[in-house]
Regions:
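Walker B catalytic acidic pair
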Residues: 181
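Active-site-proximal or metal-binding-adjacent scaffold patches in catalytic folds
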Residues: 1-175, 185-223
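Walker B beta-strand of ABC/ABC-like P-loop ATPase nucleotide-binding domains
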Residues: 178
Length: 223
C-alpha cells in the first residue's frame, strides 16, 4: 500500500493525487472526506502512482549520480559499468559497458563523448536512410553535436543536427526525433500539418514524444 506524504484538506469538492518532483504522493481532499475513502482511492490508483514515481526516480538522476553510480544509459536501458585494465576505448557487451580503468574523470568524459557520438551516428544514419526513403525527402548534411538544450534540429538549408546523447534513448523515441526533423523538410514549422505528417509515419508519436520528456535529464549528462 502506498502511503501519502501529505494529505491537504481544502474546500474543494473532489479528491486529487499529485506526485511531487521528489516522488512524494500529495493528496488534496475535501475537508470532510474520510481517511478510509482516501486510502481506498489510493489503492485503486496504486499502479499509476508507482509508475509515476518510477519515472521521477529516473529523471531525478543527475550527471554525477548516474555516471558515478556504475551505470550508463544506452537505448533506454541502464548498463553496468565495468572497469578493465589496459582497455583503451569503451566497449559494450551484453548488459555491460566496459571502460578503461585508472583514468581521470576528464579523460573518461572525453571517451564517453566520443563513444556516444560514434554510436549515435551509426544509429541515426541507419534510421535516416530508412525514414527519408519512406517519406521521400532529401537532406543536405548530418552532424552529431553536443547541445545541452536540443535533441535535434533542421535548418532551412536541410542541414540536420542530432544530439550525441540520442543513443541513450529508447529506439522508438530516437525514431520519433528522426521523423520530427525530417518532417521539417516538408513543413518548416510546428503547424497542424507538420504534426499530421509525423502522424502519417508514426501514428502513436504522441506516446513517444511524451516519453522523450522523461529523458530530458539526459541532456545534462556528460560535460
Amino acid at each position: 500500500m502506498v502511503n501519502p506524504t501529505a494529505v491537504i484538506r481544502t474546500n474543494r469538492k473532489s479528491l486529487s493525487l499529485t506526485i511531487s518532483k521528489k516522488g512524494e504522493l500529495i493528496v488534496r481532499a475535501p475537508r470532510k472526506l474520510s481517511m478510509e475513502y482516501i486510502y481506498s482511492f489510493i489503492k485503486q490508483k496504486e499502479k499509476w502512482i508507482l509508475n509515476k514515481q518510477k519515472v521521477i526516480q529516473n529523471t531525478n538522476l543527475d550527471n554525477n549520480e548516474l555516471f558515478n553510480s556504475n551505470q550508463y544509459l544506452f537505448c533506454g536501458e541502464r548498463y553496468t559499468k565495468i572497469e578493465i585494465d589496459k582497455l583503451k576505448d569503451i566497449e559494450i557487451s551484453g548488459s555491460n559497458i566496459f571502460v578503461p580503468a585508472n583514468i581521470d574523470e576528464d579523460r573518461r568524459n572525453l571517451l564517453l563523448i566520443k563513444w556516444y557520438s560514434n554510436i549515435t551516428k551509426e544509429i541515426i544514419m541507419a534510421r535516416l536512410s530508412y525514414f527519408a526513403d519512406l517519406m521521400q525527402v532529401n537532406y543536405s548534411s548530418v552532424k552529431i553535436d553536443n547541445s545541452k538544450s536540443k535533441w535535434g534540429s533542421c535548418s532551412i538549408n536541410a542541414e540536420l543536427k542530432f544530439n550525441l546523447r540520442l543513443s541513450m534513448l529508447p529506439h522508438k523515441v530516437i525514431d520519433y526525433i528522426v521523423i520530427h526533423e525530417l518532417s521539417h523538410l516538408l513543413e518548416f514549422n510546428h503547424s497542424k500539418e507538420f504534426y499530421r505528417i509525423i502522424e502519417s509515419v508514426m501514428p502513436d508519436y504522441k506516446k513517444h514524444r511524451a516519453r522523450l520528456k522523461e529523458y530530458n535529464f539526459a541532456l545534462q549528462l556528460l560535460r
